[in-house]
């Protein structure tokens, strides 16, 4: 079973969203990091796959949907067919993960990335097995209505370094942030 990767940017008060958007002003380099991490495949001829909830899908500006050069799976119990632009629809995270093991996808997919929202992160983080959390810590509080679940530090260890992840504090638009990676293997 392939490892599962979650990627998220979170404010000091654990906020990840506000009114269907990010709680902070656009941070171009942070977004580039998200693009690079979720798009870059380590295997020639394979693509990464992103899994997201319906609200996360619709929070992406239409011109940026689907997330390009990645296979996009949207989760929804209500929708009957994939929203326009999405490659696949699944009823649950488990169904989406089963889909990645089907013959049509098994040999096409390199890394699997969970890109939101809260409930999808929570379910992924509580699954058994090898899971990595790529967390951008926005070092400031922002009013939010959607939050990231607490990271259980009994289970998850903060890695001191991870290839491709800058270790120094970043700053854009007067907002400082840093990239962290947590991992569990059980």
Swiss-Prot record:
A GO MF label: dihydrofolate reductase activity
Binding site for NADP(+): 9, 15-21, 54-56, 76-78, 116-123
Claim: Nucleotide-binding is one of the keywords in the record: no
Keywords: Acetylation, Cytoplasm, Methotrexate resistance, Mitochondrion, NADP, One-carbon metabolism, Oxidoreductase, RNA-binding
Domain called DHFR: residue spans: 3-184
InterPro entries listed in its UniProt record: DHFR, DHFR-like_dom_sf, DHFR_CS, DHFR_dom
Residue positions, PTM N6-succinyllysine: 32
EC number(s) stated in the UniProt entry for this protein: 1.5.1.3
Subcellular localization, as worded in the UniProt entry: Mitochondrion; Cytoplasm
Record pathway: Cofactor biosynthesis; tetrahydrofolate biosynthesis; 5,6,7,8-tetrahydrofolate from 7,8-dihydrofolate: step 1/1
Catalytic activity: (6S)-5,6,7,8-tetrahydrofolate + NADP(+) = 7,8-dihydrofolate + NADPH + H(+)
Alphabetical GO biological process terms: dihydrofolate metabolic process; folic acid metabolic process; one-carbon metabolic process; response to methotrexate; tetrahydrofolate biosynthetic process; tetrahydrofolate metabolic process
Keyword NADP: yes
Residues recorded with modification Cysteine derivative: 162
GO cellular component, one term: cytoplasm
Pfam families hit by this protein: DHFR_1 (PF00186)
Modified residues (N6-acetyllysine): 32
Binding positions (substrate): 30-35, 70
Quaternary structure note: Homodimer.
Sequence similarity: Belongs to the dihydrofolate reductase family.
Known role: Key enzyme in folate metabolism. Contributes to the de novo mitochondrial thymidylate biosynthesis pathway. Catalyzes an essential reaction for de novo glycine and purine synthesis, and for DNA precursor synthesis. Binds its own mRNA and that of DHFR2.
This protein's name: Dihydrofolate reductase
Gene for this chain: DHFR
């Amino acid at each position: 079973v392939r490892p599962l990767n979650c990627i998220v940017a979170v404010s000091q008060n654990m906020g990840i969203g506000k009114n269907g958007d990010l709680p902070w002003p656009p941070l171009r380099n942070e977004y580039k990091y998200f693009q690079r991490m979720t798009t870059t495949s380590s295997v020639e001829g394979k693509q990464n796959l992103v899994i997201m909830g319906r609200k996360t899908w619709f929070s992406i500006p239409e011109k940026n949907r689907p997330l390009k050069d990645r296979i996009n799976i949207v989760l929804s119990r209500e929708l009957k067919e994939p929203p326009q632009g999405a490659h696949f629809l699944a009823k649950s995270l488990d169904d989406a993960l089963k889909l990645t093991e089907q013959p049509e996808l098994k040999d096409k997919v390199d890394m699997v990335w969970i890109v939101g929202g809260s409930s999808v992160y929570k379910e992924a983080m509580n699954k058994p097995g090898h899971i990595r959390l790529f967390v951008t810590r926005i070092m400031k509080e922002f009013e939010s209505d959607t939050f990231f679940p607490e990271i259980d530090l009994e289970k998850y260890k903060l890695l001191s370094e991870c290839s491709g992840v800058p270790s120094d504090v970043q700053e854009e638009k007067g907002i400082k942030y840093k990239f962290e990676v947590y991992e569990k293997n059980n």
